């Protein structure tokens, strides 16, 4: 079936009032970026929906890209026909012959934006439904929950037919809610937090701490590969590498074992906050889930958050681990996340970290290290790259990956 257009229906944009045009403009930019390889198509954003005119470009490829664009509620590949009833009947019959099977049910659903057309919606439903029923007696008309809904849209320029409604990614257009920094480890939770953050319209930059020689190149590349899994939702993501070796060594040497984790996290948060300020971010996001590990009790969060007044947003804070894992599998980050490459969150991990660290003691022990000097030297070594669609960083050999898992 040769589709001529894809009709895109907006998600939460319909609730955004006077900001609606800004949101549509942002979505238009994101769709344009997602479809940049398709040179023939044209995108026409309207107030109530977006029309992507294919001009011969591959519909299936475009559909696959659109599935990942946040801000789209659903979309329908459509066929344009002339504004006469015979053309509509001919195209509708060909479409139904291709998709219909004996015993299936159908109905016709017409939407008319051009009220000057000689048939209203009910008349078109009856006329076209009756014709198809006569021509295809093996199909049965059914108004409630039919197998096939043939949608007819009557516009001033043409009439459009479709039989599919494909669910989009939902959410808000990425960038419409500002920019934030995501603290990305190599685990399961933070990539899921990144996905959920993007879905709420926040453009994210990844902040990843690495500690060579204690962490390997594979650990760093794993974090980049996890970032690449989220790129289809946005088109490109900045990846910020922050050297953390000296800080971890100094904290381990100077701080009681039970407070190692707390003070390391405070240093990570300070660094992320300074990077955020320099790069005009508005908030910090992470993959913490309340009570999941020692650093994620409310007492630990309070002791760690003490170093900044910047909003810390935790998209998976109230989720069970199984809920997080399900999302990780859906977005294809789970298998990567469980690859056994240690990141800096797991090295030097004390056997019995404080689950309820005392804030005054935390501040006291932290005075044993030169916080400002350590932060300054780490920031000098920060490296920023952009990860784009198709970038690969780990060995893609399936047998090697299977052995790691």
Swiss-Prot record:
* InterPro entries in the record: Rossmann-like_a/b/a_fold (IPR014729), ThiI_AANH (IPR020536), ThiI_fer (IPR054173), ThiI_N (IPR049961), THUMP_dom (IPR004114), THUMP_ThiI (IPR049962), tRNA_STrfase (IPR003720), tRNA_sulfurtransferase_ThiI (IPR050102)
Q: Which residues form the THUMP domain?
A: 60-165
Q: Might you give the EC number(s) for this enzyme?
A: 2.8.1.4
Give an example GO cellular component term for this record. cytosol
- Protein's organism: Latilactobacillus sakei subsp. sakei (strain 23K)
Q: Where does ATP bind?
A: 183-184, 208-209, 265, 287, 296
Task: State the reactions this protein catalyses.
Answer: [ThiI sulfur-carrier protein]-S-sulfanyl-L-cysteine + a uridine in tRNA + 2 reduced [2Fe-2S]-[ferredoxin] + ATP + H(+) = [ThiI sulfur-carrier protein]-L-cysteine + a 4-thiouridine in tRNA + 2 oxidized [2Fe-2S]-[ferredoxin] + AMP + diphosphate; [ThiS sulfur-carrier protein]-C-terminal Gly-Gly-AMP + S-sulfanyl-L-cysteinyl-[cysteine desulfurase] + AH2 = [ThiS sulfur-carrier protein]-C-terminal-Gly-aminoethanethioate + L-cysteinyl-[cysteine desulfurase] + A + AMP + 2 H(+)
- Is tRNA-binding one of the keywords UniProt gives this record? yes
Family the UniProt entry places it in: Belongs to the ThiI family.
GO BP annotations of the record are: thiamine biosynthetic process; thiamine diphosphate biosynthetic process; thiazole biosynthetic process; tRNA 4-thiouridine biosynthesis
The record's listing under Pfam families reads:
ThiI, ThiI_fer, THUMP
User: What CDD domains does this protein's entry cite?
Assistant: PPase_ThiI, THUMP_ThiI
Q: Where in the cell is it found?
A: Cytoplasm
Gene behind the chain? thiI
The top EC class, named as a word, is transferase
Q: What is this protein called?
A: Probable tRNA sulfurtransferase
What NCBIfam families does the annotation carry? tRNA uracil 4-sulfurtransferase ThiI
UniProt keyword annotations, A-Z: ATP-binding, Cytoplasm, Nucleotide-binding, RNA-binding, Thiamine biosynthesis, Transferase, tRNA-binding
Tell me which domain of life the UniProt entry assigns to the organism this sequence originates from: Bacteria
Biological or metabolic pathway of the protein: Cofactor biosynthesis; thiamine diphosphate biosynthesis
Q: Which HAMAP family match?
A: ThiI
Q: What is its main location?
A: cytoplasm
Q: Return one GO MF term.
A: tRNA-uracil-4 sulfurtransferase activity
This chain's function reads: Catalyzes the ATP-dependent transfer of a sulfur to tRNA to produce 4-thiouridine in position 8 of tRNAs, which functions as a near-UV photosensor. Also catalyzes the transfer of sulfur to the sulfur carrier protein ThiS, forming ThiS-thiocarboxylate. This is a step in the synthesis of thiazole, in the thiamine biosynthesis pathway. The sulfur is donated as persulfide by IscS.
